[in-house]
Swiss-Prot record:
The keyword Disulfide bond does not apply. PROSITE patterns: PORPHOBILINOGEN_DEAM. It comes from Pseudomonas syringae pv. syringae (strain B728a). Keywords: Porphyrin biosynthesis, Transferase. Belongs to the HMBS family. This is Porphobilinogen deaminase. One of its GO terms (biological process) is protoporphyrinogen IX biosynthetic process. Pathway: Porphyrin-containing compound metabolism; protoporphyrin-IX biosynthesis; coproporphyrinogen-III from 5-aminolevulinate: step 2/4. One of its GO terms (cellular component) is cytoplasm. The modification S-(dipyrrolylmethanemethyl)cysteine is found at residue 242. The keyword Nucleotide-binding does not apply. Tetrapolymerization of the monopyrrole PBG into the hydroxymethylbilane pre-uroporphyrinogen in several discrete steps. Its cofactor is dipyrromethane. CDD domains: PBP2_EcHMBS_like (cd13646).
Amino acid sequence: MSSREIRIATRKSALALWQAEYVKARLEQAHPGLLVTLVPMVSRGDKLLDSPLSKIGGKGLFVKELETALLENNADIAVHSMKDVPMDFPQGLGLFCICEREDPRDAFVSNTFASLDQLPAGSIVGTSSLRRQAQLLARRPDLQIRFLRGNVNTRLAKLDAGEYDAIILAAAGLIRLGFEDRITSAISVDDSLPAGGQGAVGIECRSVDAEIHALLAPLHHEDTAVRVIAERSLNKHLNGGCQVPIACYAVLEGDDVWLRGLVGDPSGSVLLHADARAPQTSAQALGVQVAEALLEQGAADILKAVYGEANNE
């Protein structure tokens, strides 16, 4: 096995490269002598920075180019933020490893105010996420939400330049890039339910590569995987992607998993909630159950309107 080489397809953003380097280090630690190299590339989502994700539309904005590299044998594995990974994979590819989850919460970042509750009426908050926007405006309808895209450094620079009073980012990304001190306050999952898979890193590879699967096995974290399976099952049943106002978060309680789901109107006028518990072995069915409970409350109408707006742009 010492002569084996693994090529990691990764986006070129600082956070994506951190994740790829993390996987590289874990593989080298688990398999001394293994040669691991990075194959950096630019995704469609990285190029289209002048529009909100909800307006670009489509799924797999941050993964398609990496999957093409796998299919054309230009890479052996692809490392993804799980919240960016579509529910379905191209034929011949699959998700074979989910690493231990980092902090899944959203982070409130401001140079002036200590928390979301302390923001004065009319304050400008930056985010490109309809999920965050819906929950923010439901709690604070007096805030102004302003579009914010770009990598973590770019977003922090825009805050520091005074374009925003505060911005909302994933806590995991800030922690991984060494910006933990920029987190003014972490937002409780009760106040801002995360995106499915937020904070977790997943590894995709070719389904037939049994040798690669074996090399990845030491990196797999089963507790995280069970939680992410439940969350992704909910997302899939709602036909969700990373650009729609769907939130879901699972935690383990003994042998059970508790899944909370949310669908929100981007205006904050309506937030639909549902939750349920099931044995960990039924995580996938649990996702469908909670998704169905949201659909019974009218989630399809909210999501149809969001998709309609994206298609009309």
